[in-house]
Each structure stands twice: as structure tokens, then as C-alpha cells.
């Protein structure tokens, strides 16, 4: 890959790698809680504390593919920097959701709701980027240049 192409995706790759570390942390918490109450073997059922950790991890894993798709789509089709920033915010609220779920379930609600909004924002960024691509393809009009012109005046 050339340097310019790398520069266009490096922030997205960093956010993706941070999300992998976060997933490993969540998995470690599940394993630790399982071994604490079930001995050496991993069981999917157990104490209420284990059930909360396992469910919180599973909920995060369920949303993870969607997050990766909209993160990379928004970064590639629209703009890398806002997509990477939104991705970092999503990881922050996902951490808040996970930790909140381990306490009372009502503590996890703000993280869950804000996480859904960030996913929606990334999705809309992706749609805007794809729409701009087709504007260029069919009409030769780059909407992104109009936005840059308006914002610099």
C-alpha cells in the first residue's frame, strides 16, 4: 500500500485495534468470573454475577460486527477523522455499558442508548458518502467540495 492510502485508513485501523483489546478485556472478565465461581471449567450458567458479566459481553459481541461495518464504511466513503472519533466515543460508551451492566442494569441504559445513536451517526455518514459517490459518478458534482466551500467562508 502506498503512503496516501495508509493515511486514509490509519485512524480507522487504530480504532479497530483498540476495539479488539476491549473485546479481549470483556472476554477476560467473563473467564475470570467463570473460574471464580465454577472452578477451572467454563460454564455458561452460574451465579447472578457471572450471568451479568456473560450477558453484558454477549450483548457487546452481538453489536460488534455492525459497529465495524459502519465505522469502516463511514471512514472510507465519507471522512476518516469524524468516523474514528465517533468510533472512539462508541468504545467509551460500550465500556460504560459493560461496567454499568455489572452493577444495576439501569446504570447500563445511558451507554446503550448513546451507543445506538453513535451507530446511527456512523450509518448516516456512510449513506452520505455513498450518496456523494453517486453524485460524482452520475452528475460530476462533488457535494463534499460544496460543504468545504461553505464552511471556509
From Swiss-Prot:
Could you tell me which PROSITE patterns the record lists for this protein? FLAP_GST2_LTC4S
How does this protein lie in the membrane? Multi-pass membrane protein
Cite the InterPro entries for this sequence.
Answer: 5_LipOase_AP (IPR001446), FLAP/GST2/LTC4S_CS (IPR018295), MAPEG (IPR050997), MAPEG-like_dom_sf (IPR023352), Membr-assoc_MAPEG (IPR001129)
The family database entries (SUPFAM superfamilies) matched by this protein are listed as: MAPEG domain-like
Its domain of life? Answer: Eukaryota
Report the SS bond pairs. Answer: none
Q: Which residues lie on this side of the membrane: Lumenal?
A: 1-8, 78-80, 129-153
Main localization of the protein described in the UniProt heading:
nucleus
Location comes to: Nucleus membrane; Endoplasmic reticulum membrane
> What are the GO MF terms of this UniProt record?
arachidonate binding; enzyme activator activity; glutathione peroxidase activity; glutathione transferase activity; leukotriene-C4 synthase activity
Which Gene Ontology cellular component annotation is one that this UniProt entry carries?
nuclear membrane
Q: Cytoplasmic compartment: which residues?
A: 31-52, 103-107
Which residue ranges does UniProt annotate as crossing the membrane?
9-30, 53-77, 81-102, 116-128
Keyword list, A-Z = Endoplasmic reticulum, Leukotriene biosynthesis, Membrane, Nucleus, Transmembrane, Transmembrane helix
In the record, where are the intramembrane regions found? 108-115
- Which GO biological process entries does UniProt record here? leukotriene biosynthetic process
According to its UniProt entry, what is the function of this protein?
A: Required for leukotriene biosynthesis by ALOX5 (5-lipoxygenase). Anchors ALOX5 to the membrane. Binds arachidonic acid, and could play an essential role in the transfer of arachidonic acid to ALOX5. Binds to MK-886, a compound that blocks the biosynthesis of leukotrienes.
Which comment does the entry carry about domains? Answer: The C-terminal part after residue 140 is mostly disordered.
**Similarity remark:** Belongs to the MAPEG family.
Oligomeric state and interaction partners are given as:
Homotrimer. Interacts with LTC4S and ALOX5.
**Protein name (Swiss-Prot/TrEMBL):** Arachidonate 5-lipoxygenase-activating protein
Amino acid at each position: 500500500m502506498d503512503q496516501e492510502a495508509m493515511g486514509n485508513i490509519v485512524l480507522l485501523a487504530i480504532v479497530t485495534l483498540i476495539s479488539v483489546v476491549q473485546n479481549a478485556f470483556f472476554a477476560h472478565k467473563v473467564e475470570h468470573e467463570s473460574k471464580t465461581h465454577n472452578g477451572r471449567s467454563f460454564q455458561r450458567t452460574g451465579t447472578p454475577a457471572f450471568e451479568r458479566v456473560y450477558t453484558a459481553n454477549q450483548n457487546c459481541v452481538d453489536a460488534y460486527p455492525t459497529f465495524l461495518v459502519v465505522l469502516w464504511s463511514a471512514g472510507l466513503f465519507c471522512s476518516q477523522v469524524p468516523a474514528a472519533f465517533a468510533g472512539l466515543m462508541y468504545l467509551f460508551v460500550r465500556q460504560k455499558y459493560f461496567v454499568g451492566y455489572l452493577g444495576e442494569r439501569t446504570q447500563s441504559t445511558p451507554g446503550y442508548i448513546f451507543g445506538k445513536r453513535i451507530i446511527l451517526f456512523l450509518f448516516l455518514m456512510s449513506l452520505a458518502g455513498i450518496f456523494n459517490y453517486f453524485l460524482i459518478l452520475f452528475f460530476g458534482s462533488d457535494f463534499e467540495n460544496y460543504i468545504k466551500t461553505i464552511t471556509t467562508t
